[in-house]
Amino acid sequence: IWWLSGMSWTNIYLPITTSLLLAATMSSTDSASVFAILRSQKMNLKHNLRPMLELESGSNDPMAYMLTIVLIQFIQSAGMGVGAIAASFIIQFIVGAAAGYVLGKLAIRMLNKLNIDNQALYPILLLAFVFFTFSITDLLKGNGYLAVYIAGIMVGNNKIMHRKDIYTFMDGLTWLFQIIMFLMLGLLVNPHEMIEVAVVALLIGVFMIVIGRPLSVFLCLLPFRKITLKSRLFVSWVGLRGAVPIIFATYPVVANVEGSNMIFNIVFFITIVSLIVQGTSVSFVARLLHLSTPLEKTGNDFGVELPEEIDTDLSDMTITMEMLNEADT
């Protein structure tokens, strides 16, 4: 980014610190878009690629947030040294992880112990607890995103009451928030400013998709010998950028960082390019690499939620006239 911005034909110059800030805001990926596209095509993934992509997407959001905040502080305060940056990272990580663990345990206990007559209030209670977790962690100078992520992992992997109602509510709320975010972010964009950074943004986007993402994926997966080459190639391709990078790009704008408007426009442009190029080709690449499987049809559970400790399941079956004729009545 810094090298490209120094070219005379770009008419754009970003200092090394601002270039790092731009890279930090773009480091978050969105696996939810990948799975939404696959579900629309009635496809699933082999080799447990889904949990790997979910882990990556969920874990890189807190890190992208920390990098963005620390780099903004570094740019605004020239006296901030490497030691202060490292200390800020450690404090945010430790406080965020500890708060997420403790409050996640508290959320599990609260959901299972409280007896609310109206079961529709359980998802509302958990949503309020999410905001509480983020707020109290941020008040303690920790990473609120990391705390919410860890608390969510704990709640999702423990036995809780009304799990299905909570999941359905949160899934719908996720889509609603994504629609609102893209609508609000679209209102912040000026088309003529997008044209000014189009060439540089396109080159950065191509570099990220073709070189940066595959290189980082292959380096990170080197210790995992059992992951096939096709799986590595697919993970390299599906590094979609969603609304989160655009949200992080608004932080420099709010902080009045030099070149912040340019950062926002570049991030927005790259996100749109990523969604168009990678988003439209996810299912094609999965089929090309023979990593797609038909989406398993789930039966009708008739609105009944069985406790997890009961080793049984509900299934539905269509009764035909031939079956009735052959039955012993």
Q: What name fits each language-model region?
A:
Residues 1-295:
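Transmembrane helical cores of multi-pass secondary ion antiporters/exchangers
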Residues 292-329:
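Cytosolic regulatory domains of K+ homeostasis systems
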